[in-house]
Amino acid sequence: GLINLYAIDDAHEREAKGMYDDFLLGGTDSEMVNDSLGPKVQLYLNSPDFVTGDLVNETPRLTVLLEDADGINTVGNGIGHDLIAVIDGEASMTYTLNDYYVSDLGDYTRGTVSYVLPELTEGKHSLVFRAGDMMNYATTVAVDLEVVKGLRPRILEVGTTHSPAYE
């Protein structure tokens, strides 16, 4: 590689220039283990208890837990390099979710996608989610869901916490 440098010191009316060419940009880690597997994917809508075919509201929250030793690919650099959700196989209902991926703190191998789906019509739908790792191995997961208009969330537990603030 080559980097050309230029600097100016307005206070002393001086200029400087230079170059640096002793670096490599790109390449491959020779010690990397190629597992040839896509990311582990756990997907649910609204609740971790979701199973394929469950009932959901019109705007369910899609949550996807991802893990891969090579890291999760969110580069968005062409086909297969995005986190994608597709509803009912429709191109018009394809959502790129790269911007909704958050890595676990200090861990490039794991993270979560959290995205509220746009309003869906009442009835049965399918959702396909695709994720790839940094070695371009992909995993695709499909689930079915049934949208029920006006469905209210299930409240599983209500708790209170003492406020630490006082006068």
What function would you assign to each model-found segment?
Residues 27-60, 146-167:
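Short, compositionally biased P/S/T/A/G/V-rich stretches that sit at domain boundaries
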Residues 6, 12-26, 42-49, 63-149:
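Long, low-complexity serine/threonine/glycine- and acidic-rich segments characteristic of extracellular
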Residues 1-4:
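Short, surface-exposed ligand- or partner-binding patches at beta-edge/loop junctions that are enriched
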